[in-house]
Amino acid sequence: FKSKRGVILMSSEEKPYQIWIGRNYANCSGCRRCEIACSLHHEGRIWPEASRIRVFMLVPTLEMPHLCAQCDDAPCIPSCPVGALSVNEETGAITVDKDKCTGCGNCIDACPGRVPVIHPTEKYALICDLCGGDPQCVKVCQEGGYNALWVVKREKKSVSYKLYAKEPKEIVKELAYKFYRDLAEELV
């Protein structure tokens, strides 16, 4: 609705934006605090294998966080044969219905970054749900002073971040060329 001055106002329940987790791979120290915070938030204990964010080091000194890019076309959703995946309209995050998901892995194959993983002891996919709008991985990364992760507020479905939906080996290869130039061929 509009105010007297014609300014568009939003109700307190409706947010004009969704969030996305920005990433600067060059700032990642490899501390894995993000994996710990994620597993504590979702599993109630330190269990990096059940984290929705993973940190990879495929080349020495090049650590990189790997998490859902929140693709605007979300190819993982139609790939699910049981309809266990959906988009949270408030945050824009992909959500997994644990009760429906069979752990078949179709979402992994459909994801351009192969981001989803299957829970280590249960039969359901793990995909970043943005912690309901308050990403714990970002908090600990910022608190640690690394600033490899940050929250980006965006208009609902205004920008595609699919360029971040890459497999870790692709990202590390790009980083290796950026940092090591001619030596990159030997490293990757």
Task: Please provide the spans of the model-predicted regions.
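N-terminal cysteine/histidine-rich coordination modules
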Residues: M10-C28, R32-V59
